[in-house]
From Swiss-Prot:
This is Probable endonuclease 4. Its cofactor is Zn(2+). Keywords: DNA damage, DNA repair, Endonuclease, Hydrolase, Metal-binding, Nuclease, Zinc. It catalyses: Endonucleolytic cleavage to 5'-phosphooligonucleotide end-products. One of its GO terms (molecular function) is DNA-(apurinic or apyrimidinic site) endonuclease activity. It holds the Pfam family AP_endonuc_2. Endonuclease IV plays a role in DNA repair. It cleaves phosphodiester bonds at apurinic or apyrimidinic (AP) sites, generating a 3'-hydroxyl group and a 5'-terminal sugar phosphate.
Length: 283
């Protein structure tokens, strides 16, 4: 039986030790967190001096890769040059913080929403994202950046595999960029994971390469195929359903990757229960 690296997106309140205790409470072996406020510029109270010890402890406890989530406010594709510059500088700072974890032996990625072109057009948006990442990697290359598959709402870039491939092809340091596969977003974007799982995986492999997928956001979908809504549902309570998640956790290529739950906490034990549910689906 394959052991899943799985957990949820956790609060950093209380610092590194409190973060790990929350993971223990839900029975996780991987998790995500925001390195600073997800909606604003204020940094969270994570002591850089404690990062290395945190990484060493995770490594000793056998954790899978961390999938840290960059703040939503970052928009590498935006019209405003000052905001793009902020995103570049802040993302580089986040990577520097996380590099200490990686250097302690614990694998860690930082996941970003690629960005929204806000009316400039997809081609311009994808180019700006690539250029922004190139500037980030001129400053630091300590941690791989993962581009998240998007649902396609508004003017999001990365709404299909080809757009993500375009962004990645524009990055000079290709070893530093990969993909996070969000199950809700992929279905909402129009890929039929329920009835054509193998076909979707072939499309992903042809456009990007399965080897470039480094993490999974494990979410059910409220609205489903082609809705472009980006509304997560709890596992088994949406349009993807338990048969899809059974297929996912028994797919040798995907099941070895860190899986991060971003579902709503309906009760204090929601994520603990969902982690147990997904582990119970493994053959």
């Amino acid at each position: 039986m394959m052991e899943l690296y799985i957990g949820s997106h956790l609060s950093t309140a209380g610092g590194w030790n409190a973060l790990l205790e929350r993971s223990h409470e839900e029975g996780g072996t991987a998790f995500a967190f925001f390195p600073r406020s997800p909606y604003g510029k204020r940094s969270k109270a994570l002591d850089p001096a404690g990062a290395a010890a945190f990484g060493a402890r995770l490594k000793a406890e056998g954790y899978g890769p961390l999938v840290v989530h960059a703040p939503y406010v970052y928009n590498l594709a935006g019209k405003d040059e000052a905001k793009r510059t902020f995103a570049i500088e802040a993302l580089a700072e986040d990577i520097e913080l996380l590099t200490a974890i990686r250097e302690a032996g614990q694998e860690v990625y930082i996941n970003i929403h690629p960005g929204a072109h806000v009316g400039q057009g997809t081609e311009t948006g994808c180019r700006l994202i690539s250029e922004g990442l190139n500037q980030v990697f001129e400053r630091t290359t300590g941690v791989m950046v993962l581009l998240e598959t998007m649902a396609g709402k508004g003017t999001e870039c990365g709404r299909n595999f080809e757009e993500l491939a375009t962004i990645m092809n524009g990055v000079e340091n290709k070893a530093n960029v990969g993909v996070t596969f969000d199950t809700c977003h992929v279905l909402d974007a129009g890929y039929d994971l329920v009835h054509d799982y193998d076909g979707v995986m072939r499309q992903l492999d042809e456009a990007i390469g399965l080897a470039e997928v480094k993490a999974i956001h494990v979410n059910d979908s409220q609205f489903g195929l082609g809705s472009h809504k980006d509304r997560h549902a709890n596992i088994g309570q949406g349009q993807l359903g338990i048969p899809f998640f059974t297929r996912l956790v028994n797919d040798p290529t995907m099941a070895k990757l860190p899986m991060i739950l971003e579902t709503k906490e309906q009760t204090p034990t929601t994520h603990r229960d969902e982690i147990a549910l997904l582990r119970g689906l493994v053959d």
